[in-house]
Every structure is written in C-alpha cells, then in structure tokens.
Amino acid sequence: MKKIIRLLGLTMVLMLVFTMVLPLNLYAASTVTVDWGTNYQTIDGFGVSEAFHQSNNIALLGDTKKKEIYDLLFSTTKGAGFSIFRSILGDGGTWGNATDGPNKTMQPSETTWDWKESNDDQISMIREIQSGYGINKILYTVWSPPAWMKSNGSTSRGYLKTDKYQAYATYLAEHIKNYKSKFGIDITHIGISNEPNLETDYSSCTWTAAQFKTFMKDYLVPTFDKEGITAKVIMGEPMSCTESFAIDCLNDATALTRTDIVGCHNYGSSYTTFPTTKAKGKGIWQTEISDMNGNDTTITDGLKWSKQIFDFMTITQGNAWNYWWGACYKTYNGEGLIQMDMNSKTYKVAKRLYTVGQYSRFIRPGWQRFAATSNPVSNVYVTAYKDPATGKFAIVAMNDGYTNQSITYTLKGFTPDSVTPYTTSSTQDLAEGTKITVSGGSFTANLAANSITTFVGGSDVNPGIYGDVNGDKVVDAIDFALYKQYLIKQISTFPSPDGMKLADVNGDNSVDAIDFALIKKYLLGSITKLPV
C-alpha cells in the first residue's frame, strides 16, 4: 500500500512538473489564414533621411565604410532595402554646425538665386543611391522657408508671412524645376512643412490647418499648375499621427487637387485612422519617427519598431513608413538606425535596422497588403503583402512574447510550392532559413520568442477559374459531371493541370461532397459566387 502511495505521489509530482514546463516549449499550433483575395492598401515604400549633414558625415568615414552603410540601408540582399530618401530643403539657417545643421539656401534673398551644388551635401548621396540601388522616390521637406519670408526674420520659430505666400509657392516650384535641370535630381515628392505644431531653436515654421488651405488653394495649386509641376505634395507632417492639419485642404475642392499625400510623424502618440484622407482617396505617409531617449540597440527595441510598422499598416492603413536618420553621428540615443563615431570613423548597427528591414527589404513599392489573421495568439502579430503582377508575396510574423509559438499558415487563393523564412532575433540579422514546403495549401513554422520572421514566396498570378476542372475557362455541366466521377472514384484527378486546386471551391484544402454541392448550387443559380 505504501508502495502504491509513493508511486501515486511520484506520478502527481511528475505531472505537475510536466505541466509547469509544457507552456515554455510545446504549444498546439495556432492558425493564421492568409487570403489572397481580400486586399487593402498599396505600399509606396519604406525610407530614411540623412538631413542636417548626415550624408556628409557618412562620406567622412571613407569610401569603404560609406559603401558598407549604403548597403546596410539600401541593398535588398545585404541590408534593409529602403526605397524612399527624405531630404531637407536648405533654408540657410545660422544655428548648428557642419556635423548637425541646416544646408545653405538656394534663395538667400527675394531677388537672388544661388544654384550651387555645394549648397546641398545631400545631392551627391542621392546620385549614388539612385545609380547604385535604384532609389527613385526622393522627398524634400521644408523645415523652414528662408528667413526673409518669416514673421520673425529667422529660420527658427515664427511663421510664413502672408505676403510671402506667393514667393514661397514659387520657391518650391523653382527648386523642383532646377534640381532636375541643374543637378539631375528628380524631386518626386515635396513636403511643404515639417512639424507645423512645433516651435524649435532649430529650423521650424508653424502653420495651422486654415493657413495650409489658403496657401494651397490660392498660391501653390495655381503656381504648380502653371509651371507643370508633377511632384506629389505631402501635406502636414505634424509631430503626431493625425490628419487634422490636412483636413481643411482635404475638404476644399481646389486645395484637394494638389493634396496628394497626408503626412504625419508619430512622436508620443498612437497610430490612428485617417477617415477623411481615405474617403478622398489620398495616400498616407509617416515621414519620420525615432527614439530621442537612450540608445537601446537590442532586439527588445527592435521589436518595438516592427510592432509600430504593424500598427501603422493595420490601424492607419498607411502607404509609406519612414524612420528618421538612417545613419547619424549621435551614439547616445535612438535617432539613427546606425550610429557613427566621427572621431574613430567607425559605426555600430542597432537591431532596429534589421527588424524594420524585415518589412522594408521584402515589401517593395507597388506591393499590396492582403488579409492575414493579425493576432492569432497573444504577442504574435502577422501581416501579408504581395506583388499582384508577379505573384511574389511576403508574410511578416512577429513574436514579442517570451515563449516560442508554432503557427500554421493556411493559404487561401494561392498555392506556392514553398516559402523561405528570414529571421531577426537576438542572435540573427535577416538570416535566411531553410525552405519550408507548402503542403495541402498550408505550412507550419516555429516562431521563436522575441523574434520576427518574413516568409517569402511566389505564386501563380493566373490561378484559373475555380470550379473549372477541365480547363475550358467556364464552369458548366461538364465540370459537374467530372466532380461526380471524382467523388465516386471513377477518376483520381481532373483534366486541367490545376484541376485539384480549382476543384476546392470552398477553400478548405480538400475536394469533397461540400464542393460538389456548391457547384450544383452555382449551376442551378442558387448562389452567384463561389466561396473562394
């Protein structure tokens, strides 16, 4: 009896220990459904800036390190693959220095233009990244108009004088035209303000929504129309994630014609919806974000930024996400993805470069977000993106929890043969993993704790017509008869090469009586659309 009691006691202890250990390592797979047919916003890209002389600081590290930094920022095989470059339109301010300060202005007075390439140290970098990496989205943002246009005669603080609205509209148009004709730089996007709700000792200029509307409606629109300017105008770019500074322009018929994109930053705020922007069919760009506190270079900080991208894509449903500096001289905070030591001429890479790169390297301009179960289990966040033209796709899955998660991805409406994972964790940086076979329309993969993985693959962009199992481009009685033959095992496959895939009309990864019944209803007219 005592032996039995001892055995029972030991069994209970082992069960308790096993129960305590189990959650750390063994989980039933959670399911993510990825639906090719449910589409959301088009992605314009991801980007960084090297404003305030950071482009020159990169060059000062020497050609070898400059190329290494360029690769880390813009290469789609060695780095983050950024596709947007944000620059400052020089204002000639007197604050700062050669390491961190404004560029010279091309218009030092109302009657004087000074088109010298040396006035803008970003030009040489733009040429290099365009020729070396194909970067063709060039955004120039104005932190401040030249001092002679301002209410206080300074590039710091103050506002644009109303009697200089036309001068400012002309100033913007002339920069776009002359950068193309004199420097070979196509400014594709122009931001008319940076953080209009903030007065600073560095370059700044305050605006209200009403002032924006007056300037756009009465000055910028007619000037850009007259000069044939095609650059897209980014409106707003306030400190927080809000469309409020663009509302007046969005609701004015004339101003709306040149309000192409509503810009925002996200300092000290949460991502929100932009209902008016969406209703008017305009784009949404976050043009800047960073951490001005301590420089956390770990995976914890890195995952913070990948979660920000997830929120921006799913809540705001934005089109472009930009970090602040790509590489910068500040080693003590998080303003840059790469920190350069200008004394030792060395640099260090923060983990956030790679976690952001899990999106920016693989999701290319023109891709489209499509449906995926966004939060299948606590601390796991998933989004999916595709190139509608080629069938390439990327599924980004992040786990910022402390336990591994097994996730099954059920693919609806597309059938790749395999996916390739790329992972960033505390020990990996965009590391390519072993190819995973897709079987029966799904695959299962472990998502390690505190990591982010992008699953990359390709699918047939012309999958055929569901229900058309004989390949004659129509669903009819012939297909119905073939279904019947398949179910009673007279045939083991269908005449069309994609017949087995196209026969699964309810998307449950099997061909059975349910599909047969759905085809019957479709042919009888009881339903007008198949589930897939």
Predicted segment positions?
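N-terminal catalytic cores of secreted or lumenal carbohydrate-active enzymes
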Residues: 29-187, 218
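Glycoside hydrolase catalytic-domain groove-lining segments
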Residues: 114-124, 230-233, 256-297
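Active-site cleft segment of glycoside hydrolase catalytic domains centered on the general acid/base Glu
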Residues: 148-252, 271-279
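Aromatic/acidic polysaccharide-binding cleft in carbohydrate-active enzymes
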Residues: 281-361, 368-378
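Carbohydrate-binding surface patches
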Residues: 375-417, 450
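C-terminal beta-strand-rich structural cap/linker in extracellular carbohydrate-active enzymes
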Residues: 435-461
